[in-house]
Curated annotation (Swiss-Prot):
This is SF-assemblin. It is found in: Cytoplasm, Cytoskeleton. It comes from Spermatozopsis similis (Green alga). Pfam families: SF-assemblin (PF06705). Belongs to the SF-assemblin family. Residues 17-30 have a biased composition (Low complexity). Keywords: Coiled coil, Cytoplasm, Cytoskeleton, Microtubule, Phosphoprotein. Major component of the striated microtubule-associated fibers (SMAFs; system-I-fibers). Residues 39-284 are annotated as: Rod. Consists of at least four isoforms including two phosphorylated.
Length: 284
């Protein structure tokens, strides 16, 4: 596992006290430790932002699934209501047809009874009337049957159209979900790549600093081996080297802080751009 920034800083072999004889000698532990702590805090802040951004994406996905389920349920309820209405209409028409048939049969029976009581010379006329009424009933029966078949055909066509629309809606929802998951996976992959690049840059800088410290340590040991120099020259050289090292450490500290600020700003800008892009996609 990759060590934390604090662990990496704590494990670096710095000298506890300034040693003479080198332009890089001094006590940079405090400055570099503080710089690493600031960098670690900023990286933790960036990681927290990425975590919040991922949680927002998951919450939005869950809300969209719930909305899709609610729409599907509403459509199912509408189809059920329509089927109930169609069944009620068919039942009502069947009862109406039965009542009409009973009514006309009673009328025919009444006419037949009244015809039997009439005079013999009116029997032919009554028979003609009854035959005409029978033909009318047959025609009406045929019309009702044709209308019933037409109604059934219309209902089947409407039900088929509704099923096709439901299938189209489900296919569109699946396609949208797949495209959204692809986009989210690409975004997460890009974020992981950027974080890896930042970590790689930090590791490279760590190796450079350790090499410089090794060089500084060797130079200090060489100076310790030449103690035959005069005290005055030695003191002057040590003071000059300490001042130079302090200036170099201060410049390096400022450069590291500036680089860390640029890295954090770039990551923040990239995060905002991703959020704006996702917001535009969702609104569209």
């Amino acid at each position: 596992p990759t060590p934390s920034p604090e662990a990496r800083v704590a494990s670096r072999p710095f000298l506890d006290s300034p040693l003479p004889g080198s332009p890089r000698s001094g006590s940079p532990t405090g400055y570099i430790t503080a710089t690493k702590a600031i960098s670690a805090g900023k990286l933790e802040h960036v990681a927290e932002k990425f975590s919040n951004f991922y949680n927002e994406i998951e919450l939005e996905k869950q809300q969209r699934r719930m909305a899709d389920a609610a729409r599907f349920q509403m459509l199912t309820d509408s189809i059920a209501k329509l089927e109930k209405s169609l069944e009620a209409e068919i039942k009502r028409r069947a009862e109406s047809d039965k009542q009409i048939q009973v009514h006309f049969e009673s009328e025919v029976k009444g006419l037949q009874e009244r015809t039997a009581l009439q005079l013999a010379d009116l029997q032919a006329a009554f028979k003609t009337s009854v035959d005409g009424l029978s033909r009318t009933m047959q025609d009406l029966h045929t019309i009702i049957k044709e209308e019933r078949e037409q109604r059934r055909s219309d209902i089947e066509h409407l039900a088929g159209s509704l099923v096709n629309k439901v299938n189209e809606c489900v296919a569109a929802l699946d396609e949208e979900r797949i495209s959204r998951m692809d986009a989210e996976s690409k975004i997460l992959k890009q974020i992981a790549t950027d974080v890896f690049r930042v970590q790689e840059k930090i590791d490279t800088e760590k190796g450079t600093r350790e090499a410089e410290l090794a060089t500084l340590r060797s130079e200090i040991h060489e100076v310790l081996g030449n103690r035959n120099l005069s005290d005055e020259k030695f003191q002057t050289l040590v003071l000059d080297e300490i001042n130079n090292l302090k200036s170099a450490v201060q410049m390096e500290r400022e450069e590291r802080i500036s680089e860390d600020d640029e890295i954090v700003q770039a990551v923040n800008d990239y995060t905002r751009a991703l959020q704006d892009g996702l917001r535009i996609v969702n609104n569209s």
